[in-house]
Amino acid sequence: MSTSPDNLFCPEQNFYGPDSEKIYIDGSLHPVKVGMRRIKLSKTYTLHGTDFSSFPLYDTSGPYSDPSVTIDLHKGLPSTRDFWQKNRTDIEVCPGKNPSPMNNRTPVRAKQGKSVTQMHYARKGIITPEMEYVAIRENQQLEEWIERFSSNGSSVKPVTPEFVRDEIAKGRAIIPANINHPELEPMAIGRNFRVKINANIGNSALASSISEEVEKSVWACRWGADTVMDLSTGKNIHQTREWILRNSPVPIGTVPIYQALEKVGGKAEELNWNIYRDTLIEQAEQGVDYFTIHSGILLDFLPAAQRRTTGIVSRGGSIIAKWCRAHKQENFLYSHFDDICDILRSYDIAISIGDALRPGSIADANDEAQFSELKTLGELTLKAWKYDVQVMIEGPGHVPLNLVEENMRKQLEYCHEAPFYTLGPLVTDIAAGYDHVNSAIGGTLLASLGCAMLCYVTPKEHLGLPDKNDVREGVIVHKLAAHAADIAKGSPSALLHDKLMSSARYSFAWNDQFNLSLDPVKTRQVHAESSQQNTGDGTDDHFCTMCGPDFCSMKKSQEVTGK
C-alpha cells in the first residue's frame, strides 16, 4: 500500500447548509482569529428581553466549514499558530531534522533548560494566545447573554483569558497544543469549561488504510469531536499519524506504546525504555498534542487484577503487565516518569495518565485494582506538575449507575482536581451493538458531576473496527451527553440553545429546528422522508406526520392561548 494516498478529497465546505456561515472573532490581547459557526434563523426569537435572529455555535470543524479557504489534503491545513510563535525566544529547530514533506516545516523544541508548556506560562502569570483563543471560543460570542444570566443568580460568568490562565496554573484544566501542531485551533479540557468529547480512530492489523483514517478524522471533527485519538496498530503508523496531524484542526492524541510495540515485532517482553523514549520524541516532533501513558500500573496491583471477571482490558495496560511479568521488574513507564516529563515539557505535550486497570465489566467496577491505580495516578500528577506538564486523568470503563458518583469523588480527591477523561462509563455489559448509547448514559451522569471530557464509543464497540458512519453516530450521541451535562451544570449558552430550539418547535419553524439540532443533516432527511406523502417538503406545515393536522398538541395550544 502506498504511504502517500492518492484517493483523498476535500469534503464539501457548505456541509451544514445555506443557513450556516463561518465567522471569526478577533482577539484583543493577541493576533488570534477564533472561528465559529453562526446559524441564521428564519425569524427573530425574543428570550428574556434579548432578540436572537442568529445563533453562534462552538465549532470544531476548522477550515472544513469555511468555503473561502482552499484545502488540499495532500498539503495539510493552514498553519494557524506559526504566526504566534515566530517571535518566541524559548524554542529552537530540532537539529538534524528534515522539514515535513507536507507543510515544509522543520520540527521545533524548547531550548536547553526551558519549558514551553501552557502550565509554565500560566504559573508565571502570562496569558498566551492559546489562552485568549480558548476564552473567546468558550463564550460563543454570547457574553452579554451570559452576563444577563448571571445577574439573575447564576454563578456562571463569561470566560476571560485570566480565568483560563488561572485554571491552567492550578491544574484544573489543560490546553493540549504541541508547538509542532500549527494547524491546531486551541481548546480547553476542564470541569469549569464546556464538556468535551474525544473520538478514537486508527487502523488495525486487519483493516483500514491511511486515506480511510484521514477521512474518519476529518469526519469526526466536522460532526463535533473536540479531540481525536489515533490508535493505529497496523501498518504505516508513522505515515498515518502524519497525514492525520497535518489535516487536523483539533488536538490529536496517541498511545505511544502501540508504535513502540510495532518496533519490536509485537513482542511486549522486548520493549525497553530506549525504544519507548525514541518513540515519544518521534511523535513529539510530528506534533502529537497529548499522550496516553500507562505509568500507574504497578507490579503490586497485578494479583488484584488477576482476580477480576475480565482481567486487564486496556491494550496498553496488558502490554505493560506482560512486560512486568516477563522481567519481574517494575513498570518502566513508572520508573522513567521523570524522563517522560522532561520530554513532554520540551514540546508542550499534555499527558493523559492511562487507566490501565479500568474495569471491563460492571462486576469489576470500583475494585481494589482500579482504585489502587487511581491513587498512583494522583502521585504521578503531582510529579508531572513539578515539570509544568499539563495532566488529565483517564477513567473507566464499565461502571453501574449506582457506582458512578464514587468514581468522580475519588478522582477529585486522589488526583488533585486534574481533569477527568473517561470512556463512558458503560453502565451495563449487555448493550453490544448499542454501546454508544450505553456509554452516553453513564457519560452524561459523570460529566454532570465534573468529568471534563468523554471518550466516545461507537456502535462497533466490542464488535469491530468502526467506519466513518459509526464515527458520526458515536460523536453525535456523545455530543448529546456532553450537552445534557452542560445543561445540568447551568451553562447559559447550552440553556439558550435549548430555549431557541423549543421556540422554533412551538413556532413550527422547521428549518430552524433542523439547523439548531446536533445533526442537521439527519433531522432534515428524516422530516423530508416523513413528509413525502404531503405536497412540498413539509417545512411550511404546522404539524408533523406523528400527529397530523388535527391532533398536534402545540397547534391546539396555540389555538387555546392565542399565541
From Swiss-Prot:
Catalysed reaction, written as an equation: 5-amino-1-(5-phospho-beta-D-ribosyl)imidazole + S-adenosyl-L-methionine = 4-amino-2-methyl-5-(phosphooxymethyl)pyrimidine + CO + 5'-deoxyadenosine + formate + L-methionine + 3 H(+)
Gene Ontology BP annotations: thiamine biosynthetic process; thiamine diphosphate biosynthetic process
Top-rank taxon, per record: Bacteria
This enzyme's EC code(s): 4.1.99.17
GO MF term (any one): carbon-carbon lyase activity
Protein family (similarity comment): Belongs to the ThiC family.
Cofactor: [4Fe-4S] cluster
Record's function text: Catalyzes the synthesis of the hydroxymethylpyrimidine phosphate (HMP-P) moiety of thiamine from aminoimidazole ribotide (AIR) in a radical S-adenosyl-L-methionine (SAM)-dependent reaction.
Pathway given in the UniProt record: Cofactor biosynthesis; thiamine diphosphate biosynthesis
Gene3D superfamilies: 6.10.250.620, Radical SAM ThiC family, central domain
PANTHER family: PHOSPHOMETHYLPYRIMIDINE SYNTHASE, CHLOROPLASTIC (PTHR30557:SF1), THIAMINE BIOSYNTHESIS PROTEIN THIC (PTHR30557)
Protein name (database record): Phosphomethylpyrimidine synthase
Binding sites annotated in the UniProt record for [4Fe-4S] cluster: C544, C547, C552
Cofactor: how bound: Binds 1 [4Fe-4S] cluster per subunit. The cluster is coordinated with 3 cysteines and an exchangeable S-adenosyl-L-methionine.
HAMAP family documented for this protein: ThiC
Cellular component terms (Gene Ontology): cytosol
